[in-house]
C-alpha cells in the first residue's frame, strides 16, 4: 500500500479501515535485521550468521504482535461486529500476505465466537499452500536483495504457516488472558460488542 496507488475509489462501496499492527510486515522485519548502512554487499558470512540468529520464529513473532496490539485486534472484531455500513456488512481482513497479522485476527475472532481450536488451526495451516508460488518466491527474492540467503528460518517466517505457530499464539492467549474473548476485552471490546460479534458470525450463513 505504501509503494503503489490506492486501487479502491474513495467514494466507492468499499470502506477501508486501516489498523496498523507493528511487527508483522515481512519487509519491515527484514529491514530491521539489516545494519544501519543497509548496504547488503558489505555483509560478511559472520554478519549474515549473526543476522539469522536474530530472526524470530513465527511463534515468537506472533506472541510479540499479540502483546502490543490488543486494541487493534479489538477494533477489527468491533468492525466485523458492527460494520460501518449496515447495508454492506461483509468484512475482508487482510495484511500484506494474509498470513500473520490476518491469521492472528481471524484466529482471535473465531476463537472468541466459540469455534473449535482444531478448526482454527487447520484453517490457518491452509495459508501456506495458498501463498505458494509467485508470492512466496517474491518474498525470498526480497530477502536476497538485502544480501540474505535462502535460509529455512527466513522461508518459514515469510512463506509458511505451520500449525505450531498459531498453536503457540493460542496457548499464549490462554495463559495470559484465559481466552480470546478476554484478550479482546483487554483491548477495549465490550461485552455488547462481543455478543454482536457472535451473533453476526454465527448467523452469517
Please place each PLM-identified region on the residue numbering.
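Ser/Thr-glycine-rich phosphate-binding loops at phosphate-binding pockets of nucleotides
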Residues: 97, 101-102
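Cys-dependent protein tyrosine phosphatase-like superfamily
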Residues: 1-92, 104-205
Amino acid at each position: 500500500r505504501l509503494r503503489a496507488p490506492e486501487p479502491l475509489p474513495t467514494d466507492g462501496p468499499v470502506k477501508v479501515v486501516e489498523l496498523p499492527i507493528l511487527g508483522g510486515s515481512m519487509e519491515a522485519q527484514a529491514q530491521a535485521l539489516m545494519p544501519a548502512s543497509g548496504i547488503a554487499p558489505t555483509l560478511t558470512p559472520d554478519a549474515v550468521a549473526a543476522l539469522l540468529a536474530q530472526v524470530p520464529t513465527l511463534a515468537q513473532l506472533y506472541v510479540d504482535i499479540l502483546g502490543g496490539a490488543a486494541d487493534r485486534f479489538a477494533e477489527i472484531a468491533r468492525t466485523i461486529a458492527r460494520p460501518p455500513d449496515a447495508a454492506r456488512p461483509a468484512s475482508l481482513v487482510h495484511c500484506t500476505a494474509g498470513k500473520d497479522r490476518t491469521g492472528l485476527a481471524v484466529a482471535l475472532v473465531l476463537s472468541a465466537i466459540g469455534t473449535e481450536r482444531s478448526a482454527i488451526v487447520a484453517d490457518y495451516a491452509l495459508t501456506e499452500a495458498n501463498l505458494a508460488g509467485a508470492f512466496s518466491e517474491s518474498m525470498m527474492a526480497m530477502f536476497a536483495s538485502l544480501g540474505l540467503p535462502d535460509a529455512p528460518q527466513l522461508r518459514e517466517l515469510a512463506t509458511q504457516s505451520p500449525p505450531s505457530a498459531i498453536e503457540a499464539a493460542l496457548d499464549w492467549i490462554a495463559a495470559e488472558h484465559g481466552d480470546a474473548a478476554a484478550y479482546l476485552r483487554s483491548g477495549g471490546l465490550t461485552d455488547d460488542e462481543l455478543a454482536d460479534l457472535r451473533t453476526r458470525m454465527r448467523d452469517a450463513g
